[in-house]
Amino acid sequence: MEDTIPVIDVENLSDQTEGKKLRDACEKWGCFRIINHSTPLTLMAEMKRVSEALLDLPVEIKKNNKDVIAGSGYKAPSDVNPLYEALGLYDLGSSQVMQDFCSQLNVTPYQRQVMEAYGKAIHELAVKIGEKMAESLGIFGADFEDWPCQFRINKYHFTPKAIGSLGVQLHTDSGFLTILQDDESVGGLEIVNQSGSFVSVPPFHGTLLVNLGDIAKVWSNGRFFNVKHRVQCKEAAIRFSIATFMLGPRKGNVEAPIEMVDHDHPRLYQPFVYEDFRKLRVSKKMHTGEALELLRLW
């Protein structure tokens, strides 16, 4: 398995050629690596250090990280994902949510400063990428500024006995897009391409990964690919990653813009509220995109 996912230069996204590369990546892969993304490497390194420190806290403290919605707080190792644990907060842009998270885990002022700086940088990047994805389809002025971003720091307890096991089961993300700062030394991420084959995505210093979720497929009226992915243990080493999920509209429905709908491209999915869709995925235990078929019009 080779790393063949596209590489997108964020600095050149105003260029027509790079814009076409972005659209092709969204339609054919649903996943791409970004370079020249303007998030400082020093900030990324500090955020990883903060993540490691927080995930090394005693379990009794980590359990204080309560869910706002199901799955948004502390995730302990489970029968389904015994090698995986995570901490998270539901809305990265909310100062109150950030305050609650920091209070729950006794976060130091410096750690909070790093988290806030990182959150601001990644949110701005997510909005920019969303806008450029829209522009690649000929939609100008799309506004993703108020779409909430869920934040999660992940730890994989990979041991010699775990090699060959899954750290996280195969799934699609429920939201619009995910920006992933992957572990730079411990691999394991795999995506499924459109032919159904697994493609390994090895670490690459200084880059970020973007995965498109179910909402991207709906918003683009079926043009964008919601990529399935998993994490597999390939070596006995602790693995960390940092994920920011741009979910869906804070208010109103998830639906394809009118520019995406015409006689040759009828609306594929009925409009819905993101949170209702998230609950549907959980209640039906449909974690690889199947829940979209329940909302399909054509």
Please state what every model-predicted region is:
Residues M1-W298:
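Peripheral, non-catalytic segments flanking oxidoreductase cores
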